[in-house]
């Protein structure tokens, strides 16, 4: 080969970087970059999505290590911040002129739409992390032109920087808008920390076209946990459901969607009427003809702005947003009772406005010339109403409340202010997370109040004594562990609700949930309450132990016992200081959405026809609400299975010959190649693991078990915990993850 002339010449012509701009091994155009190309999800669209367990990594957070937003917010002079917002609201900008010379109504819509994505079903959405800055929310049809509202606030954000998050600023601007226009607000709390990427865990629906709703309704029933009647809307279509201008029909959809946001009829009427006391809608012309792409689809030169409007000036009197045009009152920048005055004073007829959308005007030209134009002082208009406004008059229940507010304006103002506070703070969790001088002192039931600890807390000696008493009760590892897990695992990182503090697992509705095995739960609670009573009565001072603390301590005892039996002496961390909520402090209806449809950690899956998600998807969803990482989810499930901590005491997924011990047997056996697995149910939800040689069934498992051998990412983690030399690490990692779950709601420790 070396004597071959052509070969010699080829070898002589070795490519050198300075001789050519084109490497022969990397020829051709560079069309795609890292992250592009056909993805795994393109090939396998049903692949389990574990990305929701690795959101908001420190790798994407631009703040310094150790940055504490709560402390930064506390350093603000809130009155000075508010004054800057007041001043900004009446300083109209040429690039986006203020209606009536006041940006207040615009900021109210912005704040409302930031918070209004919240839904009580899973606690996701809401204003808590400033998600309105990111797609898809920044490009929802219902959020049209709110990109301008946020940009108008940039001077304030720029001035206060890291001390004022976007999430807090959006809500604060809404509060300031109300105050600037004459309404006393119920309060404001800061503490919403920004995130730096779009939320991946929120299911907004399965539709692939904006404003569609063909996937979310099975007949008249809205898919759970969705809170909007159409893809890309906050609540309902203001023209009427599916564009049908029927106020009575629309009322039922309003009731459902606002109910999904945890609002009752009284609060719903207050919010709609109060919000529509201010400002106007915008539909100067047909949006389909004149409005261009939303921010996420706009060109790079648009610099984050979307919905470019080519009609007239594109702003001011020519603005197109919802496609509906008009104002509700003749004082759109002042708080008043005129919304109800107009609603009841006029008879209304349905028309199509200049934007081509259904809207309502007073019959017989009544009210003409009473409403000022937003930009031209020489023009006057009649008031208008949306189809959904007329629902407040034509639905019998809404009408009663509307008329009551009409006749009692002071109550209306208070009801609206309180409902607004609930709207904008519903996802902030317990009041101890609220920051700032305007936090209301009044305790509200929807805040899931827990009494302050007003007694001396147990010390290490007391803890050791109580642990011995729990051990001597004869309660099993399974009973101790599942009770503590059931108490703590109600926590939702989405809206910061649930958790072990308050001890609400002993109260309705949690004490009746199937997943908590009510009969067994009652036995455990009765036993622990006897220990609590004996301990508290034996104290000469103010020292007490709460049942909330005892439940968690009992779980720690169970884990320690399981570890010791497996040969590991350890002490599970325990931090006392929880208090006991009462039944009167517990809104049963509001707690019902926290009941799990599934808890893969206890191998519980409710048999519901409308739950189409797989067991493994529901497991990951639960893990995300518990703020767990992939390894934490994995080690917790494996440990729970080894301890036999299924909700009903079943053997499903308990892949061990020594249940009740904290071992890594689950992982060893799920990785065992001497087994073959076969579905034992038509629905492929339960499986038998048989000896490959004899065919004898050795184990039974659910999809939430088998996924750790099937999914390549989870199998990789399972392999770490399934080796012969890892049991000590497994126990350590389990205890760390367990302690995390037990303290998820302990904001006093953070």
Swiss-Prot record:
Enzyme's top EC category: oxidoreductase
Gene3D superfamilies registered for this protein in UniProt: 1.10.520.10, Peroxidase, domain 2
Cofactor binding mode and count: Binds 1 heme b (iron(II)-protoporphyrin IX) group per dimer.
Necessary cofactors: heme b
Pfam families for this protein: peroxidase
Keyword entries, A-Z: Heme, Hydrogen peroxide, Iron, Metal-binding, Oxidoreductase, Peroxidase
Active site: 113
Record EC number: 1.11.1.21
Cross-link for Tryptophyl-tyrosyl-methioninium (Trp-Tyr) (with M-261), residue positions: 112-235
NCBIfam families: cat_per_HPI, PRK15061.1
Protein name: Catalase-peroxidase
Organism of origin: Christiangramia forsetii (strain DSM 17595 / CGMCC 1.15422 / KT0803) (Gramella forsetii)
Lineage: Bacteria, Pseudomonadati, Bacteroidota, Flavobacteriia, Flavobacteriales
């Amino acid at each position: 080969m070396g004597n071959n002339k052509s070969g010699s010449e080829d070898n002589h012509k070795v490519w050198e970087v300075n001789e050519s701009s084109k490497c022969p091994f990397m020829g051709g155009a560079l069309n795609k970059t890292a992250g592009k190309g056909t993805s795994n999800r393109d090939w396998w669209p049903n692949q389990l999505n574990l990305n929701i367990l690795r959101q908001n990594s420190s790798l994407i957070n631009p703040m310094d290590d150790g940055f504490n937003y709560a402390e930064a917010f506390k350093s603000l002079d809130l009155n000075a911040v508010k004054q800057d917002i007041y001043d900004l609201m009446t300083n109209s900008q040429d690039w986006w002129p203020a209606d009536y010379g006041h940006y207040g109504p615009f900021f109210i819509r912005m704040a409302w739409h930031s918070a209004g994505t919240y839904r009580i079903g899973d606690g996701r959405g809401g204003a808590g992390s400033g998600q309105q800055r990111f797609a898809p929310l920044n490009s929802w049809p219902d959020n049209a032109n709110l990109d301008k509202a946020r940009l108008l606030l940039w001077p304030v954000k720029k001035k206060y920087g890291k001390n004022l998050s976007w999430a807090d600023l959006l809500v604060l601007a809404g509060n300031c808008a109300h105050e600037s226009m004459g309404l006393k607000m119920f309060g404001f709390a800061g503490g919403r920390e920004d995130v730096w990427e779009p939320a991946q865990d929120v299911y907004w629906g399965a539709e692939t076209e904006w404003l569609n709703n063909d996937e979310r309704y099975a007949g008249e029933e809205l898919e759970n946990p969705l809170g909007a009647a159409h893809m890309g809307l906050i609540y309902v279509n203001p023209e009427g459901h599916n564009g049908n201008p029927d106020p009575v029909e629309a009322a039922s959809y309003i009731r459902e969607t606002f109910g999904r946001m945890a609002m009752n009829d009284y609060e719903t009427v207050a919010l709609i009427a109060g919000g529509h006391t201010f400002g106007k809608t915008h539909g100067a012309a047909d949006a389909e003809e004149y409005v261009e792409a939303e921010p996420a689809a706009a060109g790079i030169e648009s610099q984050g702005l979307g919905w470019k409007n080519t009609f007239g000036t594109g702003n001011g009197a020519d603005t197109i947003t919802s496609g509906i045009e008009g104002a509700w009152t003749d004082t759109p920048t002042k708080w008043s009772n005129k919304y109800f005055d107009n609603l009841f004073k006029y008879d209304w007829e349905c028309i199509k406005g200049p934007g081509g959308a259904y809207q309502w005007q007073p019959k017989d030209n009544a009210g003409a010339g009473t409403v000022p134009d937003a930009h031209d002082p020489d023009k006057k208009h009649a008031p208008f109403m949306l189809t959904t406004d007329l629902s407040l008059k034509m639905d019998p229940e809404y009408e009663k409340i509307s008329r009551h507010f009409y006749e009692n304006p002071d109550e209306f103002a208070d009801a609206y202010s309180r409902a607004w506070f609930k709207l904008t703070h519903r996802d902030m969790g317990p009041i101890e997370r609220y920051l700032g001088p305007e936090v209301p002192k009044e305790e509200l039931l929807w805040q899931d109040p827990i009494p302050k600890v007003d007694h001396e807390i147990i010390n290490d000696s007391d803890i050791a004594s109580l642990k011995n008493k729990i051990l001597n009760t004869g309660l099993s590892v399974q009973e101790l562990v599942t009770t503590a897990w059931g108490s703590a695992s109600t926590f939702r990182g989405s809206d910061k609700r649930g958790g072990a503090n308050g001890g609400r697992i002993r109260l309705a509705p949690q004490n009746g949930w199937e997943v908590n095995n009510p009969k067994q739960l009652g036995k455990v609670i009765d036993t622990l309450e006897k220990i609590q009573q004996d301990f508290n009565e034996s104290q000469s001072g103010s020292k007490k132990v709460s049942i909330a603390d005892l439940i968690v301590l009992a779980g720690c005892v169970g884990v320690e016992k399981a570890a010791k039996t497996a040969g590991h002496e350890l002490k599970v961390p325990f931090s006392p200081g929880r208090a006991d909520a009462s039944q009167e402090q517990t809104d049963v209806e509001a707690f019902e959405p926290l009941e799990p449809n599934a808890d893969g950690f206890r191998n519980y899956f409710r048999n519901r026809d409308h739950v189409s998600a797989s067991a493994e998807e529901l497991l990951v969803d639960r893990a995300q609400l518990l703020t767990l990482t992939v390894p934490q989810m994995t080690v917790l499930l494996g440990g729970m299975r080894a301890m036999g901590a299924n909700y009903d005491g079943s053997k499903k997924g308990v892949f061990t010959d020594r249940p009740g011990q904290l071992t890594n047997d689950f992982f060893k056996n799920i990785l065992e190649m001497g087994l073959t697995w076969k579905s034992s149910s038509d629905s492929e939800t339960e499986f038998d693991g048989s000896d490959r040689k004899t065919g004898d069934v050795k184990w039974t498992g659910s999809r939430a078990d088998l996924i750790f051998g099937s999914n390549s990412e989870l199998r990789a983690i399972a392999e770490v915990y399934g080796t012969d030399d890892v049991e000590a690490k497994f126990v350590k990692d389990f205890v760390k993850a367990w302690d995390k779950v037990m303290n998820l709601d302990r904001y006093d420790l953070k």
